[in-house]
Amino acid sequence: YSGMSGVRRIDAFRVGGAIEAGYLLDDLFVEVIADGCHLPKELLQLIYKVKGADRICLVTDSMRGAGMPDGHYVLGNKNTGLDTIVEDGVAKLPDRCSFAGSVATSDRLVRTFRNLTSAPLYEVVRMASLTPAKLLGISHQTGSIANGKKADLIIFDEHISVSFVMVNGRPLIA
């Protein structure tokens, strides 16, 4: 959404852009950075109403400052990338004219999307797991809990704070 065209005016006529076309294509998946900064509450609600949990992928678009304290970080290649500033949980270019990727973590996306849209938690979790796996064509391997799939699991509490992570059936030590 950040770099996409929306409704615009050409002479006296209004024409739809890529965003509106995406809403009209039922089979199209949309990727959403639901960090509470990139998109306002009302747009997240509209996206959820139009596309539903089976066509929304929650994506972090995170850079190396994700999960780190506010400060200076590099976007892209650590030697030749862009300098960025992370302030109040938002990555920005140094002149503060634009976002510079995201510093959101997946749990933040789930928490924020649920809080802003009131979508059921099971649907929001699907948007961060099974729906992206389907888009990538790997839902037979991951994205849900089933015999024969990778045991990539997280456990979180009622505040959607992660307390346990398992990758390929092996617990990660924090």
Task: Tell what function each PLM region has.
Residues 9, 38-41:
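Loop/helix-junction capping segments adjacent to catalytic residues or to phosphate/diphosphate-binding pockets
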Residues 4-6, 36, 160:
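Flexible, active-site-proximal loop/turn residues at the rims of small-molecule/cofactor binding pockets
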Residues 14-32, 36, 43, 48-60, ...:
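His/Asp/Glu-enriched, well-ordered alpha-helical/loop segment
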Residues 159-166:
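Short, Lys/Arg- and Gly-enriched loop/turn segments at beta-strand edges
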Residues 1-17:
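Divalent metal-binding pocket/active-site signature
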